[in-house]
Amino acid sequence: METISTIAALRERLAAYRRAGKSIGLVPTMGYLHAGHMELVSRARAENDIVVVSIFVNPLQFGANEDLAKYPRDLERDSAILRDGKVDFIFAPGVADMYPRPMETVVDVPKLGTELEGAVRPGHFAGVATVVTKLFNIVQPDSAYFGEKDYQQVAIIRRMVEDLAQPVRVVPVPTVRDADGLALSSRNVYLSTEQRAAAVIVPKALAEAERLYNEGADDPIAFEAALRDFIASEPFATPEVTAVRHPDTLEPLTNLQGQPILVALFVRIGATRLLDNRVVGRKQASSDKAA
């Protein structure tokens, strides 16, 4: 495994593999890796000759009052984890290498990017789309791997790839969860013991959503209100987004029954924002995995 910090060096190393016809898989991350990330790595390893994991805390996707400065960083720890995952390259650039000058060019998918999480984090998904495009340009992967926990992000990247004819296969990978159902996230480290116990309200709310749907709930406004009340019953929890949408377009629905629906939650536990989602009403069972 080799760790590379500059764009030029990574391009040079990958060019030889590309000339030899080797397939390249990219797992973009912001580091502080957990079992969810390693599920992405495992999928990439199974499907590609060469696996690149990028570790870059992207300032473009953080708002003015968000957690850029305190976002957990530990490259030594991450490197040890990735070595066990048989990764070929870690790409760990600095901000000055990725953004040597203030960015004048921004990639935006405005219709998808201003809904749901984008409504409470303006500019976030433009920052995501911009850095992912830049990583695609640098690595030129055949396939790129993203967690389904970030459902909206996957939808945006898929649309971006389609609209811009980027030659990359976008591969969504099922969410990995702790034993109590909480989706793994690098931000879970922010939670105190009490807050971590309270955070289980998020997966419980998804289970409640499935129960309501299976019992025939059809009015999206009442459905969303019921989920807000359910989450708010936990004193540590503040529901910021409780939404039901079309799972492909993310558009609002006028009724729920007779179709699969996306339930999207964005919940603040103390000062920490957690997001989660579930597609309800599809015939196949959930593909989420336990850690």
UniProtKB/Swiss-Prot annotation:
It catalyses: (R)-pantoate + beta-alanine + ATP = (R)-pantothenate + AMP + diphosphate + H(+). Its EC number is 6.3.2.1. Its main location: cytoplasm. (R)-pantoate binds at residues 61, 153. Pathway: Cofactor biosynthesis; (R)-pantothenate biosynthesis; (R)-pantothenate from (R)-pantoate and beta-alanine: step 1/1. GO terms for molecular function: ATP binding; pantoate-beta-alanine ligase activity. It comes from the Bacteria. Beta-alanine binds at residue 61. It is found in: Cytoplasm. GO terms for biological process: pantothenate biosynthetic process. Keywords: ATP-binding, Cytoplasm, Ligase, Nucleotide-binding, Pantothenate biosynthesis. Disulfide bonds: none annotated. It is an enzyme of class 6 (ligase). GO terms for cellular component: cytosol. ATP binds at residues 30-37, 147-150, 176, 184-187. The keyword Amino-acid biosynthesis does not apply. InterPro entries: Cyt_trans-like, Pantoate_ligase, Pantoate_ligase_C, Rossmann-like_a/b/a_fold. The active site is at residue 37. Catalyzes the condensation of pantoate with beta-alanine in an ATP-dependent reaction via a pantoyl-adenylate intermediate. Belongs to the pantothenate synthetase family. The reaction proceeds by a bi uni uni bi ping pong mechanism. Homodimer. NCBIfam families: cyt_tran_rel, panC. This is Pantothenate synthetase.
